[in-house]
Design a protein with these regions (language model features):
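Bacterial N-terminal signal peptides that target proteins for export
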Residues: 1-8
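Short, low-complexity N-terminal intrinsically disordered segments enriched in polar/charged residues
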Residues: 4, 18-49
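Bacterial N-terminal signal peptides
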Residues: 8-16
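A general secondary-structure boundary signal
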Residues: 31-35, 58, 126
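Short solvent-exposed beta->alpha transition segments
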Residues: 37-38, 45, 53-109
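Internal amphipathic alpha-helical segments of the cytochrome P450 catalytic fold
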Residues: 52-53, 137
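Exposed beta-sheet edge and beta->alpha loop/turn motif
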Residues: 94-146
Length: 146
């Protein structure tokens, strides 16, 4: 039980550090990689539909390998925090950043997307999605909304 909680804490740290960079990034704004945008869009569609367990399966193996407790915690958090916002009415990608380094994470390829989003019960919201390129494929490794 202790290991999944530690892994959940590490995953949440990656989410918040990575997505905090989206809000005010020291990295240059870039034209987003179309493949990364497609992955983020597919992942957000699963979240929008309330398919949180499906969205969890799209995380990198290093996050999924923490086990069922990690998935249960992540799904529970999304149900408690994201579900009450209601349907997604609109979403617009407004900024994208790229970096090879991320505090607390191995060097690699990271893209950060910042969206202006309107939900059924929160008309002005911001979403941040962090993507990691592993084994040549983009995967969502972080998500935050406010």
């Amino acid at each position: 039980m202790r290991i999944p909680l530690l892994c959940f804490g590490a995953m949440m740290a990656l989410f918040f550090v990575g997505n905090a960079l989206c809000a005010s990034s020291p990295y240059p704004v870039v034209k987003p990689d179309p493949q990364a945008v497609a992955v983020a869009t597919k992942w957000l569609s699963a979240v929008d539909a309330g398919n949180y367990a499906e969205a969890f399966t799209m995380f990198p193996a290093r996050i999924r390998s923490a086990g069922d407790a990690m998935e249960t915690q992540w799904v529970g958090y999304q149900r408690a925090k994201r579900t009450p916002l209601g349907w997604t009415l609109s979403r617009k990608l407004v900024k994208a950043w790229f970096t090879r380094t991320l505090p607390g994470s191995p060097d690699g390829y990271y893209e950060f997307f910042h969206y202006n989003t309107s939900f059924q019960r929160k008309t002005q919201a911001a979403e941040s999605v962090t993507l990691t390129k592993e084994s040549g494929h983009w995967q969502v490794s972080g998500y935050r909304f406010r």
